[in-house]
Amino acid sequence: MKEYNVGYCAGVYDLFHIGHVNLFRRAKEKCETLIVGVLTDELVIHFKKNPPYIPFEERLQMVESCRYVDRAIPVTFDNIGKIDAWDQLHYDCFFSGDDYSGNEVWMKEKRLLNERGSDIYFFSYTQTTSSTKIKQAIEAQIRKEM
């Protein structure tokens, strides 16, 4: 039996890469059912001020096709917060990369989840690849070709 019944993680998952797969694999090793939230284009634009490279429906399909993911759902303004998502899904653990482990807001949310019988678990961040690094490499190549 695994440590958690239902696990949840959420993200943009633009330019899907090995870091995303590592997160899903590690999360699935700890839970029976893994639900992954994918931020809508509207949310990405709201928070990052730029649209994702890959449209929402395609990002959702890529996440759904990953063998470690049991269910992929849209993340909207109604369920962007970890507590709002918990109210809808009643997950036992929220999984994330450790790049957020010292974040004050995340620690507050961890306490609120603990009060509901849930937790946040941080995995080591995949250092070699990130969407940001991929975007920077693409942009550098475009500038070089101009």
Regions found by a protein language model. Name each.
Residues 1-146:
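Nucleotidyltransferase catalytic core that binds NTPs
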